[in-house]
Amino acid sequence: MVGYIGDIHISESDAEVAECLSAEYKRQNTSLQMIASENFVSRAVLQAQGSVLTNKYAEGYPGSRYYCGCSEVDVAETLAVERLCKLFGCKYANVQPHSGSQANQQVYMALLKPGDTVLGMSLDSGGHLTHGAGPNVSGKWFNAVPYNVRRDTNLLDMGEIEEIALRVKPNLIIAGASSYPRRIDFKAFRAIADKVGAYFLADIAHYSGLIAGGQYPTPFGYAHVVTSTTHKTLRGPRGGVIMTDDEEIHKKLRSAVFPGMQGGALMHVIAAKAVAFREAMSPDFKVYVSQILDNSRALAAVLATGGLDVVTGGTDSHMVVVDLRSKGLTGRDVSSSLERAGIVCNKNAVPFDTEKPWVTSGIRLGAAAETSRGLVVKDFEKIGQLVLKIVDSMRAGADMSVVESGVREEVATLVRVVPYDTLAC
């Protein structure tokens, strides 16, 4: 067939992209991936996402599509929905959102009108952009009111949150965060929502895998709506989901997702979600999640013992947040040095941070990805020691190129290679 290149390997058809894929595979497998929103998916998830379902366009929902030829993708989506509901014990689920951010926006579209009041955690306290931050559409369409953590403990103060809610009478209250390492009292949030007649949204994007593994409180039974990403601790493909136990809310959500904000669903991603949900129901996944908690707590303990200010004093999740202000360092500088040394994390705002978002006063470290690669407590204790070496050396004015090179050599002894190189390019 003239011009058809469907059977040509990417290394032949597009050497530039093939080189990029190979380089990224090498990067992932020669450094420690400590970004809390990242993980390593299984070969099965990769295979589903890179499957022939990429070729199929499907608008609507199973049994009610606008295009023909959807019988098999209907099976994939139905499996994903059924497995997600079973995994979290909810009645209704939508697996079509392309991302967690879009899932949140679709909830707003379903339940709110422009100008309504939304109460969510501030960015520097650990909240997410989509919870009402000024630059985000959630902060532009709605009257966004933030709540903060306590200055003395950096923990949520449910009494203060209730006071704010009683004063501003929000239409929606959001619980959930991108850098809050402790447990969230979903029951208390629902009680506040009921007092002011608000909807309660739990965004569990970071915690969903921990919840599925029984290591973090569940919002189900309290939240009117629950959103999540499917990567991070859930260890699936990048994407979003929306869940509820309320049939009327479910109907509104369906319309908000399609045709409200999306057209065709990404069927290859939905199939990969189904695979990940099944994996998350296995006994091995519970063991994995338990190990995440052991590892992150070990990391936090080493950092705190070594003199770093660990936000909230520890962690109940996969993430550890470090406040660097007492060291006179910025998150940008420390995270950049750590990356050169082979420890990849991210700069992060800390409570009541006055630095710009692209500078920040802290870093965030996550345990999910490296736990997937088999690292255990002793390895995370070593990682903590290496982080301390970088920070202490920066404060001492040492030659960081020498220090970083030495740390990278030690990192090489910790890295466990994920053996799906045949799928890398």
Swiss-Prot record:
Q: Please classify the protein's predominant subcellular localization into one broad category.
A: cytoplasm
Is the ATP-binding keyword given for this protein?
no
Superkingdom is Bacteria
Q: Which cofactor does it need?
A: pyridoxal 5'-phosphate
What catalytic activity does the UniProt entry give for this protein? (6R)-5,10-methylene-5,6,7,8-tetrahydrofolate + glycine + H2O = (6S)-5,6,7,8-tetrahydrofolate + L-serine
What pathway does the UniProt record associate with this protein?
One-carbon metabolism; tetrahydrofolate interconversion; Amino-acid biosynthesis; glycine biosynthesis; glycine from L-serine: step 1/1
Q: Does the keyword Amino-acid biosynthesis feature in the UniProt annotation? A: yes
Alphabetic keyword roster? Amino-acid biosynthesis, Cytoplasm, One-carbon metabolism, Pyridoxal phosphate, Transferase
Q: Where does (6S)-5,6,7,8-tetrahydrofolate bind?
A: 123, 127-129, 248
Name the site position(s) for Plays an important role in substrate specificity: 231
Annotated Gene Ontology cellular component terms: cytosol
- Which Gene3D superfamilies does the UniProt record give? Aspartate Aminotransferase, domain 1 (3.90.1150.10), Type I PLP-dependent aspartate aminotransferase-like (Major domain) (3.40.640.10)
Q: What is its EC number?
A: 2.1.2.1
Q: Where is it located?
A: Cytoplasm
A molecular function (GO) held by this record is: glycine hydroxymethyltransferase activity
Any one GO biological process: tetrahydrofolate interconversion
Q: Per its database record, what is this protein's job? A: Catalyzes the reversible interconversion of serine and glycine with tetrahydrofolate (THF) serving as the one-carbon carrier. This reaction serves as the major source of one-carbon groups required for the biosynthesis of purines, thymidylate, methionine, and other important biomolecules. Also exhibits THF-independent aldolase activity toward beta-hydroxyamino acids, producing glycine and aldehydes, via a retro-aldol mechanism.
| Family, as annotated | Belongs to the SHMT family.
PANTHER family for the chain = SERINE HYDROXYMETHYLTRANSFERASE, SERINE HYDROXYMETHYLTRANSFERASE 1
The annotated subunit structure for this chain is: Homodimer.
**Name of this protein:** Serine hydroxymethyltransferase
Please tell me the species this chain comes from. Answer: Anaplasma phagocytophilum (strain HZ)
> Its encoding gene is what?
glyA
